[in-house]
Amino acid sequence: MINSLRVIRAMINKEKTDILRNKKMLIIMFIFPVIYLFITFAGIQEFKGDGSAFVLMHSIMVPIQIIASIVAEEKEKGTFKMLMMSGVRAFEYIIGIMVIVMMFLVFGMVIFDQTGATKNSDTFEAVIVNMIAFILSMMIGFIIGVISDNQVSVGAVSLPVTLIIFFMPIV
């Protein structure tokens, strides 16, 4: 148990440095909060009000894209095999990545909350629903990352999946 916690903490630190070093990941993680922040402060009336569409995109699209990119990048570089051969178990790897990505996603949700995008919902209920959405989206991202051959193909695989998730309620 103690060894697992140590491995998970090491995975969190590794992923934190990888994410902070990769500007593309940071842009993807904060694109929707920043766009909503810009719209709010620019005073664009057409988009003012409820930011639920931005919150939805942040809760579904971002975790899928980020997790799939992380897994595909580590497969491509050979880091994934090295981690597995060094004794990192699958659940330690998954939890380590999910925790650090969840922290960044929650920070994005704080930006949404402070700018008023979530003003029409109960805060506790919104947090629970977003956490569930984050976890489910990250699991889908893990599957896409494992299926994808490399980091470039992640977008081609994740886009149809994301569109199906978004348009499923309409059908």
Question: What residues fall within each predicted segment?
Answer:
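Hydrophobic alpha-helical transmembrane segments of multi-pass membrane transport/permease proteins
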Residues: 18-66, 102, 106-107, 157-169
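Aromatic- and glycine-rich beta-strand/loop motifs that create alpha-glucan
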Residues: 1-29
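Alpha-helical transmembrane segments of integral membrane proteins
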Residues: 9, 24-28, 48-56, 92, ...
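Alpha-helical transmembrane segments and their short interhelical loops
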Residues: 90, 98-155, 169
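Residue-level signature of the cytosolic catalytic core of signaling kinases
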Residues: 1-4, 47, 60, 119-120
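Short amphipathic alpha-helical coupling elements at transmembrane boundaries
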Residues: 10-18, 81-85, 149
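Hydrophobic alpha-helical transmembrane segments of multi-pass membrane transport proteins
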Residues: 48-112
